[in-house]
Amino acid sequence: DGEQALQASLSVKEKLQIALCLEKAGVDIMEVGFPISSPGDFKSVQTISQNIKNSRICSLARCIEKDIDTAGEAMSHCDFFRIHVFLATSTLHMESKLRKNFDEIIDMAIFSVKRALRYTDDVEFSCEDASRTTMDNLCRIVEKLISCGVKTINIPDTVGYTIPNELSLIIKNLFERVPNIHKSTISVHCHNDLGMAVGNSISAIQAGARQIEGTINGIGERAGNTALEEVIMAIKVREDILGLSTNINHKEIYRTSQVISRICNMPIPSNKAIVGSNAFSHSSGIHQDGVLKNRENYEIMDPSSIGLKKVKLNLTSRSGRAAVKYYMNEMGYKDSDYNIDELYVDFLKLADKKGQVFDYDLEALAFINKKQDELEHFCLKFFSVQSISNNLSTASVTLLCGDKIYTESSTTSNGPVXAIYQALNRITHFPIILQKFQLIAKGQGKDALGQVDILVKYKKRQFHGVGLATDIIESSAQAMINVLNNIWKVKQVNKNLKNLKK
């Protein structure tokens, strides 16, 4: 279902990679494709079913013989698997889409379930558009299908129309009115058109549902599906209220989210609950001080519980002395090594000018002469690149290093940006490892600027760099120059500290 949100279909290899991540995270059941839809989807379901051992594989099928047979064939190498058949049950869908009455719908559903049971004893049935289906009809079809051997009854809010107390009432009614309901697991499948997918899912499990269908990061058609990571952590954090648990390895949540975001080319919003970059980030000085004293003051869950290493305090003009002091202590400096009052004044000036300040900026403010700090040691005087499709890229750069000028060239098969970075590295000889490269368009049309943000690793420390220009090659070069100057400042700090100790 999540793949419906993507502009292009995923390859078999990409789907398998996602499936392996989900398996490692401890997902109970993964619905991995719709085999009848294309040969590629059939191959994906087949490949995943052959490689996944610890999660149950499920395949989707309409109430059509060929769909069901194809689903069974795709998973025939599995010892255990599930076939998930679905059919619309709302009056609107029956009349305008299927052109059938409810008795015909029941007959189709029963026939399809019996067909699926030829391949596996684990059959799930979805009453498509269940949230807009009359309660009488819903109870009637659910009872008949459970009698046929359906193990899981799914109640989808197909168009994201319902609200939490309404879905809760639907589930409660099923438990009260369907006599054989205890023979099947009740599932919910919510969409996020009104922004209530997670809330609806939680209300459903409070009413008795025991399976939640969703996607990591909430990706899916239209406004998306239930974000599984949000439901999972809600169940964990509010176990006192819900009294439930899952089999999920919570420490794999963040990594799985990042992998899926990258493969699907769908960036995670910074304010996304649980996995967004700001989810455990604190900028306010009051909040930062509170978190440093006791993280529970402003955090309801431990970042490490989803696989993050530690709290992230953003150093901005809103940060207080406590945050600045915390970063200096994290870098190994004692209070006696610097003047916190002077440092904080200089920090605020830099934060107003720069926006976000990093640990190495604090070092420079504390230990480098202010006039010296304002000077950029490295300055790009000239660059040229030549790149031919399906061939090597060549770059030549002229770099001002203090009062000396150096020129260097480089040739690589990895493109013009890599060629420029190699040429710069030949001049500076800094053993840099590029960890992240991100290009963002600023503005529109021919005058748009390309902002390049990079993250590099140098001797166990991370350094950020930003470049902005209409030419993305130039902005890439500027970002690396930014990094080189930050590294140089750290080297100057170390040099000055050594001189002080002599």
From Swiss-Prot:
Pfam families, A to Z: HCS_D2 (PF22617), HMGL-like (PF00682), LeuA_dimer (PF08502)
Stretch list, region Regulatory domain: 379-502
Domain of life: Bacteria
Cofactor(s) recorded in Swiss-Prot or TrEMBL: Mn(2+)
Residue span, Pyruvate carboxyltransferase domain: 1-254
Enzyme class: transferase
GO MF, one annotated term: metal ion binding
Keywords noted in UniProt: Amino-acid biosynthesis, Branched-chain amino acid biosynthesis, Cytoplasm, Leucine biosynthesis, Manganese, Metal-binding, Plasmid, Transferase
Homology family: Belongs to the alpha-IPM synthase/homocitrate synthase family. LeuA type 1 subfamily.
Record text on subunit structure and interactions: Homodimer.
Role played: Catalyzes the condensation of the acetyl group of acetyl-CoA with 3-methyl-2-oxobutanoate (2-ketoisovalerate) to form 3-carboxy-3-hydroxy-4-methylpentanoate (2-isopropylmalate).
The protein, known as: 2-isopropylmalate synthase
